[in-house]
Design a protein with these regions (language model features):
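Flexible, charged surface loops at secondary-structure boundaries
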Residues: 14-15, 83
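S-adenosylmethionine
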Residues: 37-43, 47-166
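A generic structural signal for residues located within well-ordered alpha-helices
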Residues: 1-4, 26-28, 50
């Protein structure tokens, strides 16, 4: 399931350029996306040292190049050199959308995208996140509903970064 989720994500047209996977965990969707799109410049952002070591090992074993590893909490990284550096920010299974927007949008440069991977609750979370998205310089664009084999539904919520995060 995680692999299929990641492939559906990787096939989206916004997945290009310089991407950050916030809360990279075991590498979904980041590593799978990098395999699918080797030209992607990928940063795997994960605060847990053991997970970062695993991600480094996995990428080395897979022969992946063009991957950076950031042992950072997203909310702290957004105040540092990572702020507004990415064409795309995404996260899977990290937080509810209002908090996820606060983690991801400050990392995206103006003109870039925030693409949130959510389950069936995506639309409900979007209603609660609209104000935060606007305050952070984002604009909601669309919700994409995807269907996995076996009947599971996934929701991708696309926001564009239209102004700098205050």
């Amino acid at each position: 399931k995680h692999f299929l989720d990641s492939l559906l994500f990787a096939s989206q047209p916004e997945v290009a350029g310089k991407m950050v996977d916030v809360g990279a965990g075991a590498g979904f969707p980041g590593i799978v996306t990098k395999i699918f799109k080797p030209e992607l410049e990928l940063t795997l952002m994960e605060p847990t040292g053991k997970r970062v070591e695993f991600l480094k090992y996995a990428c080395a074993q897979l022969g992946l190049t063009g991957v950076e590893f950031a042992k950072e909490r997203a909310e702290e990284a957004a105040r540092k050199a990572w702020r507004e550096q990415f064409d795309l920010a995404s996260a899977r299974a990290v937080a509810a959308l209002p908090m996820l927007a606060e983690y991801c949008l400050p990392l995206v440069k103006v003109g870039g995208s925030f693409l949130a991977m959510k389950g069936a609750s995506g639309e409900e979370e979007l209603a609660a996140a609209r104000g935060a998205i606007r305050k952070l310089g984002g604009e909601y664009k669309e919700t994409r509903t995807l269907h996995l084999p076996g009947g599971d539904t996934r929701t991708l919520i696309l926001c564009k970064k239209i102004s700098q995060t205050p």
